[in-house]
Every structure is written in structure tokens, then in C-alpha cells.
Amino acid sequence: MTDLTTLTIAQARDALKKRELKATELTEAYLKAIELANPILNTYVAITAEQAMKMAAKSDSRLAKGHGGILEGIPLGIKDLFATQDVHTQACSYILDGFKPHYESTVTANLWRDGAVMLGKLNMDEFAMGSSNETSYYGPVISPWRKKDSNEKLVPGGSSGGSAAAVAAGLCVGATATDTGGSIRQPAAFTGTVGIKPTYGRCSRWGTIAFASSLDQAGPIGRNVRDCAILLKSMASFDEKDSTSVNLPVPDYESYIGQSIKGMKIGIPKEYYLEGMSPEIVELWQKGINWLKEAGAEIKNISLPHTKYALPAYYIVAPAEASSNLARYDGVRFGLRIPGKDVIEMYENTRSVGFGNEVKRRILIGTYVLSSGYYDAYYLKAQKVRTLVKRDFDQCFSSGVDAILTPATPTPAFGIADEKIKNDTVAMYLNDIFTVPVNMAGLPGISVPSGLSSNGLPLGLQLIGKPFAEEVIFQIAHIIEQAAGMFSAEKWWT
């Protein structure tokens, strides 16, 4: 019998509609898989088994009557950054200990409207600040991938490490995630999954716990390009409750899968060839170029001259916004409260105990760059750099380029508590060097599994598209996926 947890969203959807499979059977299979794997991989921080079975039973009832949404009966994992009504929502931080919101985020409400089933809340870096899922209050997520002939525990990437690892390990059919500087695309690349960061404004941010409001964007992680296209169709919408939400029609992304890319122009930015970059990454990039050429695309060398300034500018803009957003967590209204002799001491006690080290670091950086005397020198200058980064992309796309192809990450996944990365914050931040410019410009970007490293770990390529042209990068990503083949981790934890 087919292992139900290996079905893609498209396969499960078709089987459910034909009544060859029940939503309750599919959900139960995932809950059993989670029960077995979660003590080892630590992907879920809350498992909503009872609620999942009730949602699945309702899906079966609708399907039996010939009704049902585009995700009817599909079991999903939800990143712990999305508010889920009366269910654990803590951004994997101690400061939100015990918080259960009385409202639903717009993104998750859209998924439930379309019939999806919630399996639980997924682990992540605390407040989405991290690139390895090691900053979570609930401990690190263990990647389902291992190097050849090694038992070393690897990171799944971050901040959406739980989402990527759960999809890769077969612990949900797909997952929600968020991307502020690469938090969908980097973990997708590290785990052999597909992850898309949509254009800023495509998915509502309402009910999603904020990190950096001008950069945060929700998106899906799935097993393949088609699954991500199906998920994004549901997640994306205009929302009056989010002032940055854009009122544009949401295309049928799935209909673009399999269409020809003949005649499309693909830009290759020279600035992404970094000094000392792994030859494996360069070789993978060249393979991607060749695959697109063979599919009829035209390759065009381009320049994005301000790319090298994007990462340092990001680490001024993002912490500045984070320091402002996280000021609301004071122990007064919700979450953790550590008493003190007066209200000031209560604030200090709560925030010093409630926030982890990486979050504290970014709050301090943000407070510093926004302080009097440094605002002009750092924050305003970083915003000017951001404008230049965006202008580079605009000029490239206005010259006729349809999409840009780059590596997704400079290396494959590294070890948990890797000493070199652990003792060098900048080395950790450099994991996002290829992804951050996309956020700074507000563009859509997708990571597609494209090969394996010499030690058997997944490597990804990134496609960057024009604003609100996610369908084009889905179309091109599918070509890469078909050429590269599919990659899956061996289930060493069973």
C-alpha cells in the first residue's frame, strides 16, 4: 500500500475528490508520522490532533456531497508566527508563554476557508530571527537530511526550519512559512523542498507576528513547485486589515506549470559570483543555466551593482523595525510576566528573561541605529541603499529580463552548534547573502532543489521575478525541477 505521507498536495487532492482516500485517513497517517518523528526532529511545538481529526471529518462530509475547496482535506503545518484562534501561538519565544489568540490570521483563515486541515504549530527561530532554527525557545529542529556516512545532526535552515523539515520528513503535505531576509528560501534549499517568497503585499500580514514590517512576507513550503502554486493560490488575497496588502487578482498559479519558457530572457547577475564561493555552487548554477537554455530560454548577463551593500543595509533596517515591533512585549497584557518591585522592574525582568540572546542582540542593534545621532548615519543611509538595490532590479526587468537565476545559498546545510558559525555572528548572517536583496526590493523569489553536494546534501537555485509575477517564476522553476529530478531524505529516524 502507498505510504500516504508521500503523496503530494496535487495527488492527495485528486484522490480525495475521487473518494479513493478519506481526509481522516490522510490526517491520521500524518499524526502517526508526527508521533514517531517529532521527539527526534522537534519540528512541531504544538500538535493539534483532536482539532485536526474534526477538521478532516468535516472535509470528508463536504467531499461526500461533491463540495469542497481547493485544499479540502489537505493536512498542513503552520509556522508558529501565524495567529491561530485558541491555539498556541508564541513565535517560539518564552515571552509569549501560554499565549493563545482569540483571532485567526488572514493567511490561515484563507487556508481553512479552502478546506485545509491544521496538524499543529511548527518550530522556528525565535521571532523569526535566525538562519538555523537554533534560536527557538523549544530547542533546535534537526534536519531530516544527513551527510553521506555521517550521523552529524544538521540544521534545516531558518527561520522557517520547522516548516521545511516537516515537509521534507513527510510530517505534513505542505506548510506555511514567512520570509524577511530568506527565511523561506534558505531552509527550502537546505532540505530539498520548494519555497516561495511572494511579492511584498501579495499575502496579508494581518495576524502574523511582526519581525520587520516592511520586509516580512508569508509564503508556502511544499514538496514540489506545483504544490507551492496550489498553496499560494489559497494563501494570497487582498486584505483591508493590512495597509500593505495589494488589491490585485490572484492568478491560477497551477495553470502555468508545464508551460513553455521558450523566448523568455533569464538574467545572470555577475555580482552573485562571490570570491571563494564553493565550486559545487558555481557548477550547480551553470547546470541551471544550461537547463533553461535547453528549454528555449535566452540567457543574458546582467549587473546588479548594489547587491554587495544589501546585506549590511538589511542588518540595519530589519533590527530597527524589530526593536520597534518588539517593544509591545512588556509582560502587561499577554504572555510572560516576571514580577518586580515596580512596573519598570517588571518590564526589565520580563524582557531580560523572556527574550533569547539573538532577539536581544537585534533589539539592541535596532535601538542603537534609531537613536539620536546615529539615525542619519545608519538608518537613513541603509534606506537609501535599499532604494538603489530596488532600482538595480527595476532597470534589469525594464531591459526585457523575465526572471533572474542565482544560487539560493552559498553552502549546503551545516551542523547544529557548528563552532565556526556559532562563534561568528556575521558568518551566520552571510547565509542570507543571496536572498536578502530580494526582500529589500520587495520582489518574489523561489528556491528549487537542483542537485546534491558531494556529501549528499540538497542544493537549491533561486529564481527572482518581477513584482506580482509569481506565475512566471513557477513556470520557470518547474523546468528546473523537471531537469534536476526529485530529492528525498532517507528516514533514519524510523
UniProtKB/Swiss-Prot annotation:
Catalytic residue positions: K79 (charge relay system), S159 (charge relay system), S183 (acyl-ester intermediate)
Pfam families according to UniProt: Amidase (PF01425)
Signal peptide boundaries: none
Superkingdom, taxonomy of origin: Bacteria
UniProt keyword Oxidoreductase present: no
EC number: 6.3.5.7
EC class: ligase
Gene Ontology cellular component terms for the protein in this record: glutamyl-tRNA(Gln) amidotransferase complex
Reactions the enzyme catalyzes: L-glutamyl-tRNA(Gln) + L-glutamine + ATP + H2O = L-glutaminyl-tRNA(Gln) + L-glutamate + ADP + phosphate + H(+)
Key word Plastid present: no
Alphabetized InterPro entries for the sequence: Amidase, Amidase_CS, Amidase_dom, AS_sf, GatA
Gene Ontology MF: a single term: ATP binding
GO BP annotations listed: translation
Function: Allows the formation of correctly charged Gln-tRNA(Gln) through the transamidation of misacylated Glu-tRNA(Gln) in organisms which lack glutaminyl-tRNA synthetase. The reaction takes place in the presence of glutamine and ATP through an activated gamma-phospho-Glu-tRNA(Gln).
Family statement: Belongs to the amidase family. GatA subfamily.
Record-given protein name: Glutamyl-tRNA(Gln) amidotransferase subunit A
Classification lineage: Bacteria, Pseudomonadati, Pseudomonadota, Alphaproteobacteria, Hyphomicrobiales
Protein's gene: gatA
